[in-house]
Amino acid sequence: MDHGFYPTNLNGEGLRIGIVQARFNEPVCEALREACVAELEQLGVAGEDVLLVTVPGALEVPLALQKMAESGQFDALIALGAVIRGETYHFELVSNESGAGITRVGLDFNIAIANGILTTDTDAQAHARTREKGRDCARTAVEMANLTNDLDGLQDHGQDDDGENE
C-alpha cells in the first residue's frame, strides 16, 4: 500500500464465492449466471471454489445468502435474478424487499455481496443488461472479498493475543 491508498485487487485466486440465482425469469437469470461465472474464471477463481444454488425467485435470495454467510465458507457472495415490471405493485415490493434483504445479510454477517438482481421495465431491457451485469457482479465480488479480507487484517494489527491493543 502506497501513501495509504489501497489499490483495486481483482485477483480471484484462492477466493471462495457463493452464488444464489433466482429461477423466475429464467432466461435472463441463466444469462446473468453464464456471464458471471465466465468472468470469475477470467479473474482466477477456481471452479471448485464456486458454489451455485438456485431459489424460486428474488424474495428467496436473501435467505439462501444468509445460510451461505452463516457457514463462514465464503469470501464473498453474489445474488443474481431479474424482477421485471408487470401491471401490479408486486414489482416494487419484490425489488425493494429483495434489495433490503441482500443488504441486511451483508451487513449482519460482515460479508461482501454483489447484488445482481436486475430491476427493469421490460424483458428487452433485462436481456440487454445481462452480460455486463453478470461480469460486473463477478468483479465486484472479487474486489470486495480482497478488500474486506485485507481490512480484516488491519483489525488484527496492533493487538496482542487476547485482542487487546498493545
Swiss-Prot record:
Q: Which reaction does it catalyse?
A: (2S)-2-hydroxy-3-oxobutyl phosphate + 5-amino-6-(D-ribitylamino)uracil = 6,7-dimethyl-8-(1-D-ribityl)lumazine + phosphate + 2 H2O + H(+)
Any one GO molecular-function label of the UniProt entry:
6,7-dimethyl-8-ribityllumazine synthase activity
Query: Keywords on this record?
Result: Riboflavin biosynthesis, Transferase
Q: Which residues of the sequence carry a binding annotation for 5-amino-6-(D-ribitylamino)uracil?
A: F24, A58, L59, E60, A82, V83, I84, N115
Instruction: From the UniProt record, give the pathway where this protein acts.
Output: Cofactor biosynthesis; riboflavin biosynthesis; riboflavin from 2-hydroxy-3-oxobutyl phosphate and 5-amino-6-(D-ribitylamino)uracil: step 1/2
Give binding positions for (2S)-2-hydroxy-3-oxobutyl phosphate. Answer: E87, T88, R129
Transferase in keyword set = yes
A GO cellular-component term linked to this record? riboflavin synthase complex
Signal peptide (residue range) = none
Q: Name one GO biological process term.
A: riboflavin biosynthetic process
As recorded in UniProt, its EC number(s) are 2.5.1.78
Disulfide connectivity? none
What CDD domains has UniProt attached to this entry? Lumazine_synthase-I
Active site annotated at which positions?
A: H90 (proton donor)
Top-level EC class: transferase
Q: Which family does it belong to?
A: Belongs to the DMRL synthase family.
What does the UniProt record say this protein does? Catalyzes the formation of 6,7-dimethyl-8-ribityllumazine by condensation of 5-amino-6-(D-ribitylamino)uracil with 3,4-dihydroxy-2-butanone 4-phosphate. This is the penultimate step in the biosynthesis of riboflavin.
Q: What is this protein called?
A: 6,7-dimethyl-8-ribityllumazine synthase
* Source species: Ralstonia pickettii (strain 12J)
